[in-house]
Swiss-Prot record:
GO biological process, any: viral DNA genome replication
Known role: Eukaryotic-type DNA polymerase involved in viral genomic replication. DNA synthesis is protein primed, and acts in a strand displacement replication. Eukaryotic-type DNA polymerase involved in viral genomic replication. DNA synthesis is protein primed, and acts in a strand displacement replication. Assembles in complex with viral pTP, DBP, host NFIA and host POU2F1/OCT1 on viral origin of replication. The polymerase covalently transfers dCMP onto pTP, thereby initiating complementary strand synthesis.
Sequence segments annotated as region (Disordered): 1059-1085
This protein's name: DNA polymerase
Chief location category: host cell
Quaternary structure, from the entry: Heterodimer with the terminal protein; this heterodimer binds to bp 9 to 18 of the genome. Forms a complex with viral pTP, DBP and hosts NFIA and POU2F1/OCT1 for initiation of replication.
Catalytic activity: DNA(n) + a 2'-deoxyribonucleoside 5'-triphosphate = DNA(n+1) + diphosphate
Length: 1085
């Protein structure tokens, strides 16, 4: 039997695809151009006619054919460059067949044919007649190729949560005390005392203490202090100390860097030269990198102290030859009345840097960060605020974290009056009068023994020192507590520094990303797998689905029946444990199929399950139409902002951006839902997965364990981390950034030059402590009053004509000028705004925040079914009153509502022992408990009488325990008002005056003295980076512009009903931005 043979034939042609003009083409060309040219000549009978020997040159151009007779010149010469666009076409006449040349990858080829093609809109594949789409190709084309949609989603960068174990850290914990100075901008707060203490690396601490002494700070009780009421002295000295400390730390790093890398040049070496040396491998890769971190810490310093001192501490380091070897970058962010970031990095090239590899990614899953992971080494200077990490006052933080030191008390008003006018009201021992203290207990507790003099200033110094010591203890407790949490709860093998990030929100977000990266088997890169951030057009679409919470009363007035307050336990934490969108979004084709299938289910008669595996997670545009009026309830499922105000309404919802959870909730509540399948923007995912459940479960378990062990520190940490996670996903971004002109990056500069960005405002940060030269001295030689000449006055002769132009002397007023010795760019802050209409986002998975709020609305919907399910078909006016006030996560229930909760809703009470975390059992996981509990026996207590004036403005008269009969104090909520001047009787009198009288006889108001912070953008009434006191008076009155319709009147109040088709919203709806009949009108015109 003969062996089989295989004949291999080489292909004579190849092809490439592209588009020429507006059409797609497939270009087939000959691989062997010599044979192709010979065939071309034979086809035109050139060789047989003239019997010439054909010599094919390397480059085939029209010059090759110049030896041909004139009457046989080829007709057409054309070429297509790179297969995308026609390059040239020459009509030369003649009798030969057209010749097409292709220039491809630097070579010339003879084209056999150009075949027109079609392109699939779903996957981008080009074909002649037909083809079969591939799911993965469709998704890749939608996410990475198609220009209209490839910018909709961005990968989220990941970095391990750990801190460098070899970094040397120095903490500067400080506090200031201020008094009121009457400036041109009002009552400006000026520091008169600064106290600080150094903690951390012993070598850095000794150097810092030496610099503090050199700058004029005095040691006192293991701290350093400066007492001076002059406006700029303390700020100037504190700035000098910080700058000198940065310079010495940088000099120390640089001296060792030179030794390790044998840099012998005595002249200045620039950072660019060091980078070039690193690229040429002239730096030693085995030298251990060094890192120094200087952390300025205080309590509420980003919202007060750093702003008061801003004109000094915001001045950057001088970029002179002394520091030219460092790359100095600054991260500066004033936001929401706080200086969130003011970090400075002084970087040197890290020769030990290694590109991440497979083993690196596996190490990152444990949170371990090492020096070889960073491209730089050097000094990092940070400003951190313990308020942003504890969300409480210093006194409450001391209790929450079980600190042994106490904060003390200080009569601020007496000190303020003393520094303003030099005296204050006091007794014979100089002890401040009672009006300066907040209570009688505080007044008596701090009063010295008879005959002992009270030193007000010394007490202020001691009080400030105590504050600093409490903050020092808090810093230690936070460092050790979070390290323990990272080791024992998160099970990570890394060093953790809680002050590496500025807020609790950024800390918990980093922890979530770390745990998510650790749990994903496909996590082998610098980005989070299967979790993306919406950007540009998609970011705006997703943000429209992030709706605010519910907050309004169902009753306005004085309610005299017993009622209780029920609260959902950890609502956002429970919502985070439910399934979320997972993976990339589907292509338009697959999305259309999924939306159509979901619409079919929505059109069905049966209720839908939130956890139906055949329903994909999606955020789409939809219209929703309510059922008949008697089938509605007083807790609407959704809110709308079409009228300009957020209204929870039972009116039709048109063009709203909704999640899958919202759509199922509306369907189950009897609403008719229509998905807009031809909407411009949509997001459909293929899979549900509880992304945050593991992290939330860990925090809840840690909190319960800390409760059992009475570990208040771990309880506070786990509770804060759990509650702050939702807020990190819901962070709203914008197109603005505030930068110093001297620190503007090359990227920002190029965007400004190209017109992609523009400077919308400029702010100067000038300090009187800068070196300056004043010309007011010359004023004494100008603007002198003109005195009549005494000799002329004695003579009768008329004075001679004055020998200068003009009839008035000193008609120009001399104005002195002050010259500052500083670079302009060091004093200018620019607000740079992108000219793009869309916001770029590569940090936050905003769709998670949208679904968290949707799950929380599903909780409230299920709660509404428990309370109002039996009222379906009954008019509003005939229903029993079951709730009088509602907030995002709470309801004030009447006796009837309480009865329903302990009967029909017993399984949703926390005492039932059910889980707060979703367990894949097809049921929503949420529990409630009674917030008004008895302080003695912990039983559910009720309020006998309450007054509701407006959202977040109400008062409970008392709380009465039905078990033990204890009557305790009530509850007051008055957002935006000074609670000190509001009582239950005041709110009750206010409502009755407005309710019973046509014109109230008395005007009710609250007064307080808030602090107004001005950051980068100043005005005529406020200077940049100043803190001033403002007297604010607010009128107390019933809900002035309610977003609900008035219902049934009661004896001391009335009910409020949601808007519906019978009681429509009186506000105008969203106006049309264009004529909807534009096309028709243009045709008839």
């Amino acid at each position: 039997m003969e062996a089989s043979t295989t004949t291999v034939k080489a292909r004579s042609t190849h092809y490439i695809c592209g588009h020429a003009g507006d059409s797609f083409v497939k270009i087939i060309y000959y691989k062997d151009k010599v044979k192709a040219v010979v065939s071309y000549l034979n086809m035109n009978d050139y060789l047989n006619t003239y019997a010439l020997k054909c010599v094919i040159p390397e480059k085939i151009t029209k010059d090759f054919f110049s030896s041909c007779p004139d009457d046989l010149l080829y007709s057409t010469l054309a070429s297509i460059q790179r297969g995308y666009s026609p390059k040239k076409k020459e009509e030369l006449g003649g009798k030969w067949e057209p010749l097409l040349l292709l220039y491809h990858r630097g070579e010339e080829y003879i084209i056999r044919a150009v075949v027109p093609q079609r392109r699939c809109e779903d996957c981008g594949k080009q074909f002649v007649s037909s083809h079969q789409c591939n799911v993965r190709r469709r998704e890749f084309y939608h996410h990475a190729v198609l220009p209209d949609t490839k910018t909709w989603w961005k990968p989220i960068k990941f970095s391990p949560i750990g801190a460098l174990s070899n970094a040397k850290r120095l903490f500067i914990i400080y506090d200031i005390e201020t008094y009121t100075f009457h400036s041109g901008y009002g009552k400006q707060l000026v520091p008169y005392l600064l106290v600080m203490q150094f903690k951390g690396d012993s070598r850095l601490r000794c150097e810092a203490e030496k610099i503090a002494l050199e700058c004029g700070f005095q040691p006192y009780r293991q701290c350093f202090m400066m007492l001076n009421k002059a406006r700029d002295v303390i700020g100037h000295k504190f700035k000098d100390m910080r700058v000198q400390l940065q310079k010495r730390a940088a000099s120390d790093i640089w001296s060792r860097y030179r030794e390790k890398h044998d840099i012998l040049s005595e002249e200045g070496v620039s950072y660019a030269q060091l980078e070039a040396m690193a690229k040429d491998n002239l730096l030693k890769t085995d030298a251990e990198p060094e890192f120094t971190e200087i952390i300025v810490v205080g309590h509420n310093i980003t919202g007060f102290d750093e702003i008061v001192l801003a004109s000094h501490v915001l001045e950057g380091l001088p970029k002179d030859e002394e520091l030219q070897m460092f790359k100095i970058t600054r991260n500066f962010m004033p936001r929401a009345g706080k200086l969130l970031f003011n970090d400075v990095i002084m970087a040197l090239p890290n020769a030990a840097f290694q590109k991440p590899k497979q083993s690196t990614f596996q190490r990152w899953k444990t949170g371990d960060l090492r020096p070889e992971d960073l491209k730089w080494e050097g000094v990092r200077f940070m400003v951190r605020d313990t308020v942003l990490l504890t969300h409480s006052s210093l006194r409450n933080a001391a209790q929450a974290y079980q600190l042994e030191v106490s904060k003390g008390h200080c009569p601020y008003d007496a000190l303020n009056q003393y520094f303003m006018v030099g005296t204050y009201l006091c007794d014979e021992n100089m002890y401040p009068a009672r009006e300066y203290w907040s209570s009688d207990e505080e007044y008596l507790e701090n009063k010295p023994p008879d005959g002992e003099k009270y030193d007000l200033v010394q007490k202020a110094v001691d009080y400030c020192v105590n504050d600093v010591k409490v903050t020092v203890a808090l810093v230690k407790k936070l460092c050790s507590g979070y390290q323990q949490f990272c080791d024992e709860v998160l099970k990570l093998d890394c060093t953790f520094n809680v002050f590496q990030r500025p807020t609790i929100s950024s800390t918990t977000h980093a922890m979530f990303k770390q745990m998510f990266y650790k749990s994903e088997p496909s996590a082998v890169g610098k980005f989070l797998p299967n979790l993306e951030a919406p950007s540009e057009v998609m970011y705006e679409h997703i943000r429209k689905s992030v709706r605010g919470g519910r907050c309004y009363p169902s009753f306005l007035g004085v309610f005299t029946e017993p009622h209780l307050c029920y609260d959902i336990c950890g609502m956002y934490a429970s919502a985070l444990s439910h399934p979320m969108p997972y993976g990339p979004t589907l292509s338009p084709f697959d999305s259309a199929v999924a939306i159509a299938e979901f619409q079919r289910k929505l059109d069905g008669q049966s209720e839908l399950s939130y956890f139906d595996p055949d329903i994909f997670p999606m955020i789409v545009v939809a219209d929703a139409f309510p059922p008949s009026l008697h089938c509605l309830d007083v807790l609407p499922p959704l809110c709308s902002k079409r009228s300009g105000k957020l209204c929870w309404t039972n009116e039709p919802l048109l063009g709203e951006v909704l999640t899958t959870v919202d759509l199922i909730m509306l369907k189950n509540r009897g609403w008719r839902v229509k998905l807009i399948q031809n909407a411009e923007c949509y997001a459909v995912w293929r899979e549900w997965r509880p992304l945050c459940r593991e992290y939330v479960s860990i925090n809840i378990a840690a909190k319960e364990k800390a409760d059992r062990e009475k570990n208040q520190t771990q309880r506070s940490i786990s509770k804060l981390l759990s509650n702050a996670l939702y807020g990190s996903f819901a962070t709203r971004l914008d197109n603005k950034q505030v930068v110093f002109m001297d620190d503007m990056s090359s990227t920002t500069q190029s965007e400004l030059r190209s017109g992609k960005a523009s400077i919308v405002s400029m702010t100067s940060v000038c300090s009187r402590s800068l070196p300056q030269k004043d010309t007011s001295f010359w004023e004494r030689y100008f603007n002198l009053p003109q005195v009549e000449d005494s000799i002329s006055a004695e003579l009768n002769d008329e004075p001679e004509t004055e020998p200068f132009i003009g009839g008035e002397r000193s008609h120009v007023i001399y104005k002195p000028i002050t010259f500052l010795s500083a670079e302009c760019d060091n004093l200018l802050l620019a607000t740079v705004q992108s000219n793009s209409d869309w916001v770029k986002n590569d940090r936050y998975a905003t769709q998670v925040a949208s679904f968290v709020l949707a799950w929380s609305r599903a909780f409230m919907s299920e709660w509404a079914t428990i309370l109002y399910g039996e009222d379906i078909g009954v008019p509003y006016e005939q229903r029993k009153l079951k709730s009088v006030y509602g907030d995002t996560d709470s309801l004030f229930l009447t006796g009837e509502g309480h009865r329903l909760m302990i009967t029909k809703g017993r399984h949703k009470l926390k005492s039932s022992g059910n889980s707060l975390v979703y367990r894949d059992d097809g049921n929503l996981a949420w529990l409630v408990e009674c917030e008004t509990s008895c302080p003695s026996c912990k039983s559910d207590s009720f309020s006998s009488e309450s007054c509701f004036l407006a959202p977040k403005l109400y008062a409970l008269k008392d709380t009465t325990c039905p078990s033990c009969g204890l009557v305790s104090g009530g509850k007051l909520r008055a957002k935006g008002h000074a609670k000190s001047c509001i009582t239950y009787d005041v709110l009750k009198s206010c409502f009755l005056d407005h309710y019973l009288l046509e014109r109230p006889t008395e005007q009710y108001q609250s007064e307080r003295t808030p602090i107004k912070r001005t950051l980068a953008n100043g005005s005529a009434n406020s200077a940049p980076f100043t803190v001033v006191e403002k007297q604010l008076a607010r009128v107390i009155r019933p809900w002035n512009d309610p977003t609900m319709a008035r219902g049934t009147d009661l004896s001391q109040g009335f009910l409020l009903f949601p808007y519906d088709q019978k009681r429509p919203n009186p506000r105008p709806q969203e106006p049309l931005l264009e004529n909807p009949f534009w096309d028709d009108s243009s045709q008839t015109a």
